[in-house]
């Protein structure tokens, strides 16, 4: 069941997202290298196969695999310079060009790419600039 806030923004994993944040946006200790570096999104620990939902209505612009980083991932353009990214998925369910509504299942969570365990890496971009997803989630 989608969890959609008053502004129409949907949590990609449901209403319990606050209890499963394992890495915030911003500087952190990289779990693979142990070095301090920026983290471009928010990591939400969920079991492999958890349905991932579109945060807002929009059009899928990327649905592919990136070996060195996001693994299987999807990007959605929501218009007005706003886009979201969903990384480390085990399965992609939405192809490029598909129009989605807030709450539509677009992928299943996983641990593909540069990952230490099953989770969703969730990004929000405004005019191409990564911004803190916590500011948008309901």
What are these regions (language model features)?
Residues 44, 73-76, 101-113:
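Short hydrophobic beta/alpha edge segments that flank linear recognition/processing sites
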Residues 26, 49, 65, 77-81, ...:
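Solvent-exposed coil/turn segments that connect beta secondary-structure elements
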Residues 61-63, 81, 95-110:
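...with weaker cross-activation on analogous glycine-rich loops/strands in unrelated enzymes
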Residues 37-40, 54-93, 118-123:
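Zn2+-dependent peptidoglycan hydrolase active-site motif and core
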Residues 23, 46, 62, 88-91, ...:
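A residue-level detector for short acidic-glycine micro-motifs
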Residues 2-4, 9-10, 45, 91-104, ...:
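Acidic, glycine-rich catalytic/binding loops that coordinate metals and/or anionic ligands
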Residues 34, 66, 89, 111-112, ...:
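Residue-level structural signal for beta-strand termini and adjacent loop
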Residues 1-71, 102:
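Surface-exposed, glycine-biased beta-strand/turn segments
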């Amino acid at each position: 069941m989608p969890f959609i806030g008053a502004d129409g923004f949907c949590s990609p994993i449901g209403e319990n997202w606050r209890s499963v944040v394992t890495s915030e946006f911003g500087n952190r200790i990289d779990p693979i290298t142990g070095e301090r570096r920026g983290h471009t999104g928010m990591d939400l620990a969920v079991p492999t196969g958890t349905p991932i939902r579109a945060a807002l209505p929009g059009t899928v612009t990327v649905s592919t695999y990136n070996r060195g980083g996001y693994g299987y991932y999807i990007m959605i353009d929501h218009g007005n310079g706003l886009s979201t990214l969903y990384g480390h998925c085990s399965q992609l369910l939405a192809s490029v060009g598909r129009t989605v509504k807030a709450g539509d299942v677009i992928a299943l969570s996983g641990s593909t790419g540069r990952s230490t365990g099953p989770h969703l890496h969730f990004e929000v971009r405004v005019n191409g600039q990564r911004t803190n997803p916590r500011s948008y989630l309901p």
